[in-house]
Every structure is written in C-alpha cells, then in structure tokens.
Amino acid sequence: MIRNKAFVVRLYPNAAQTELINRTLGSARFVYNHFLARRIAAYKESGKGLTYGQTSSELTLLKQAEETSWLSEVDKFALQNSLKNLETAYKNFFRTVKQSGKKVGFPRFRKKRTGESYRTQFTNNNIQIGEGRLKLPKLGWVKTKGQQDIQGKILNVTVRRIHEGHYEASVLCEVEIPYLPAAPKFAAGVDVGIKDFAIVTDGVRFKHEQNPKYYRSTLKRLRKAQQTLSRRKKGSARYGKAKTKLARIHKRIVNKRQDFLHKLTTSLVREYEIIGTEHLKPDNMRKNRRLALSISDAGWGEFIRQLEYKAAWYGRLVSKVSPYFPSSQLCHDCGFKNPEVKNLAVRTWTCPNCGETHDRDENAALNIRREALVAAGISDTLNAHGGYVRPASAGNGLRSENHATLVV
C-alpha cells in the first residue's frame, strides 16, 4: 500500500545557511501577511477578494520590484507555498462558516516567533539525500542527523526552526507500507485514564500501561527556567539564552511523550486485529480545571491519532466507542447499569444485580472491547472469566444500538 510518510531529521546548518533559513522564514511570513492585507483591502473596496491566481501573479511582480527584490534571493517554493497556506486558511474559514461543528477563525497576520517553518517542493532532483547531509534548494548541502532513515519518493520538505540554533527538516515521502501478518490476538479494549495511561484487555487478561506524566515530572525545572526568563531583559543576549533553555525543556518533554505513544500504539497494532477505544474529546474534557493539566500531559488525542493512522497503514481496524456509551457504569458480566459509578472517586464497585466486583477501569476496558466487536459485526459472549453469558436485557442492561464508529 502506498502511503505518505514524514521523516524528521535534525539540521546542522553553517552560519551562512542559518542566515538564509531565517531570511526565508521571514520572507514567507512577509508574503503571507502582505497578501492577507491585500485580500482584506480588495474585499473592502469591491466586495470581492483576490483569488490564489491573482495573488500568485502579484507575487511575481513583487519579486521584480526594486524595493522587494530581496524576495527573489530565497527559495521560490517557500513563497509560493506561503500563498497556498493563505488560500487554505481562507477555504477552511468559509467552509466552517457554512457547516456546523467546530469553527475555524478568520486568517490572522503572522507574528515573528520561534516555531516558524517553510515548505519547499521536490522537482528536477533539487532535493537529494547524501551520507550525513541533505541537499535543499538555495541552501545546498546541509549537515544532518537521522537522514539514513529516509526512504521512498520525496514529495516535499518542511524546514522548521524549533528554537534559536535548533532546526529540523520534515521530509515527506511516498513509501510502500507492507501489511503486517495476522496479529497473534484478535481484539482489545483500551480504556485511557490519568493514573494509568491505558488499561488494555483481550477479554481475559489485563495490561496496565503506567502514565509517565512527563510534564508534571519536569514541572520544577520548567518553573525555574520560566522564572529565569522573566528576570531577563527582553532582547538581551541573556534573555535569548534563557528562552532557548526553556524551549529545550519543552522540546524534550514532547520528544519523550511522542516516543512513549509511538511505542504503545505500535505494540497495539502489532498485537491485535481489532482495537476498541473511546471516542475522546480532549478539548471538552480540558474544561474541567482540576483535570485540564493532567489530560494535556497525557496526550490522549495524539494517542488516538497515531493509533488510527497506523491501523490504516497496516490493515488493522479501530472501533471508537461513542462518548455517551457508559463503559464504566455497565457491569460487564450482566449488563446492569450503575449510575453511582459516574462519581470518579469510585474506583471499585460491586454489581447489585449479580454481585460481581469490578475495578472501574478494567470493567470499562472490557465493555469497550465488547462494543468494538459489536460494531465490527462480531458478537462477544465471553465474560472476563472466559465463561459464556446471555445478551443483556432491556432496561438497565446494554442498549441494542451501535455506539461505535469504525476506522479502517
């Protein structure tokens, strides 16, 4: 199966290349802001905005003008893609205006900041991979680390400034992704949480994945770095050093979290054919002020994103259970619904109908697994002990409608 895959490599540009990267970032930002202002002004004057084709023609004239001739000194693809990004921002805004759901705001002017990027296209072999280096338009050969992992047909490269002195390139390639062999286990239910990041069950056994809490464990260092930055004079050399140190700590947290999530999602995809998860809405869940930091630290949204694209790559199936499905409240053995379990403080409970004692998270994982199988058209009549149970009756039992969404 042909898929697009991004390979991230660290760049080590020399002084001249660093200056050119920064100039390219600034030029791309200038083009975006200039034509955003032009489109706004044109709409106010005539009631009609400018099209992408019109702005592209104006960009050519802008590069030829004496006062902005410096635009022709940087990568032309970076400027053209900046126009495309502006066009995409407009389309996303107008699309969500007409549709219900989460809204996208009107395009905003871009500020000079640390985490900027530009995208360049592959054409006529202008991007090449060498031993310990990467050739990019205008920059030439740049020293790299990690380029040996790049494979497939190169489509484009995004050059990103993480913080001062730290640059990365994301190389998007078209690669052949082979299907994995049949998984050793059939289906899993995954219940995510805060104390344990995930409880995974195959219907009989449970595996608790501990939550590493990378942000909370680094909070002391972060606060110290933030205090140091607040005491520095903005624009000074010491301010720049303090800002870079703070950015490095944040980057390390992100890298550790990504590594943990990649290892967990890869192991799930390799081990199970069907994976049932909750259809989480982290943005809504973060409205709870007491849990917001812990939810953000866990990275549930990124976990689901990785799980879905890896399942699609390798021929597995992800079944997302509705957020309204009461996975924690239902007794997995008899289907009785206990509303008292809505209280998050209840970690274990005994079913008043059948007398079975449940661990809150393990019971939820079992119910999610069962619902995932129902969505896949497979009935599950095994309880946690491997014994057969009859389908739940109406009333307090499991409802008959499907609560899951399949992602293939």
From Swiss-Prot:
GO terms for molecular function: DNA binding; endonuclease activity; metal ion binding; RNA binding. Keywords: DNA recombination, DNA-binding, Endonuclease, Hydrolase, Metal-binding, Nuclease, RNA-binding, Stress response, Transposition, Zinc. GO terms for biological process: DNA recombination; transposition. Its EC number is 3.1.21.-. The keyword Kinase does not apply. Has been shown to cleave dsDNA in a targeted manner in human (HEK293T) cells, suggesting it could be used for genome editing. InterPro entries: ARFGAP/RecO, Cas12f1-like_TNB, RNA-guided_DNA_endo/Transpos, RNA-guided_endonuclease_TnpB, Transposase, Transposase_put_HTH. The active site is at residues 191, 278, 361. Disruption phenotype: When tested in an R1 strain with only a single IS200 element (DR_1651 and DR_1652), not required for transposition of this IS element. Single tnpA or double tnpA-tnpB deletion leads to loss of transposition. It is an enzyme of class 3 (hydrolase). It holds the Pfam family HTH_OrfB_IS605. In the N-terminal section; belongs to the transposase 2 family. In the C-terminal section; belongs to the transposase 35 family. Belongs to the IS200/IS605 insertion sequence (IS) element family, formerly called IS8301. This element is subject to strain polymorphism; in the ATCC 13939 / R1 strain genome sequenced by White there are 7 complete and 1 incomplete IS200/IS605 elements. Another R1 strain has only 1 copy of this element. Another group found 2 copies of this element in untreated R1 strains. This class of protein is thought to probably be the ancestor of Cas9 and Cas12 CRISPR endonucleases. An RNA-guided dsDNA endonuclease. When guided by an RNA derived from the right-end element of its insertion sequence element (IS), cleaves DNA downstream of the 5'-TTGAT-3' transposon-associated motif (TAM). Cleaves supercoiled and linear DNA in a staggered manner 15-21 bases from the TAM yielding 5'-overhangs. Binds reRNA, an approximately 150 nucleotide base sRNA derived from the 3' end of its own gene, the right end (RE) of the insertion sequence (IS) and sequence downstream of the IS. This is RNA-guided DNA endonuclease TnpB. It comes from Deinococcus radiodurans (strain ATCC 13939 / DSM 20539 / JCM 16871 / CCUG 27074 / LMG 4051 / NBRC 15346 / NCIMB 9279 / VKM B-1422 / R1). The gene is tnpB.
